[in-house]
Amino acid sequence: VNDTVNQAMSVSIASMRALKEQVKVLDKAIEQHLEIIPNTLTSIPGIGKVYSAGIIAEIGDIHRFNAQASVAKFAGLVWHRNQSGDFEAEHSQMIKSGNRYLRYYLLEAANSVRRCDSEFRRYYDLKLKEVNKYQHKRALALTARKLVRLVFRLLKDNRLYIPPEG
């Protein structure tokens, strides 16, 4: 029984080492591709190489979008409008259409940025306190929408992020 357990453990350890090496190879490949692309997004605290590469890959050419709202709609970070006459619903859901991979990268990047950047942290905290229902999810989606505005402007102007004073 011990031989079987030892053999299974050695196979598992060898598999983990092989996977670790593959991760290193993939990280190097991402870095090589990022050298070609301007590092505008990695200048934002909390956005590393993986999020930056993912966002840029999913957006593609930023010049095909006229406004940040178009990027947000492409990512699916917009809400349904429920209205009839003068009535407009207070609670509405985010649309399910859009590029789900871009939405994932933007939401995860927003979650990371809110931890590293004080302006995004304040914005997240403000949105968190506004409602009682779905607080984190809503605040994170709105923070991601704020991040879309920043990403759009940085990529469009091809410049680095400079955090505001204060």
For each of these PLM feature ranges, what is it?
Residues 1-166:
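A detector of single, family-specific signature residues
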